[in-house]
Amino acid sequence: GFVPEGRRLFPKLTVTENLLLGAFRPTARSAIARNMDFCFETFPRLKERAKQLAGSMSGGEQQMLALGRALMSAPRILLIDEPSVGLAPLLVARTIDKIKELKEGYNLSVLMAEQNFTQAIRIADRGYVIVHGKIAFEGESAEALNNNELIREFYLGA
């Protein structure tokens, strides 16, 4: 499943219609219904807003919808590009927590590009820090979190 930067929803379609667009793999209607139920269980707010136009939702709700749409194809891998873009700090933490829950609870592999290092690395098994187009760090997430020099250089340019 793919969650693009900026969410890339269809603003004039409803939540349900956007979710159905994620069910692009040929599959039985019963599987699509199960996947829809899974999305609504995972993101109860989407069920409340099922008939609402995607373009009228908040940024956090739109991010939930983008994640839900990616889950509609029952993927084994989620590719997520900048999930925190345009979200308030509290929503960033909630979004990252939800990605972690999906990763661990449903055995999904997640490949995520994210500029918010501290949020991304706390759910990662491995991390890569790219500075000016070159890999500045590659390793286990615990190693990255304990590398004060890396963090100082990455955040402060020191």
What are the residue ranges of the model-derived segments?
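ABC-type ATPase nucleotide-binding domains, specifically the catalytic core motifs of the NBD
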Residues: 15-34, 42-47, 139, 158
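Conserved ABC ATPase signature
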Residues: 53-57
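ABC ATPase C-loop
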Residues: 70-71
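Conserved catalytic motifs of ABC-family nucleotide-binding domains
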Residues: 74
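Catalytic Walker B motif of ABC-type/P-loop ATPase nucleotide-binding domains
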Residues: 78-82
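Helical segment within the ABC ATPase nucleotide-binding domain
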Residues: 93-107
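H-loop/switch region of ABC-family ATPase nucleotide-binding domains
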Residues: 112-115
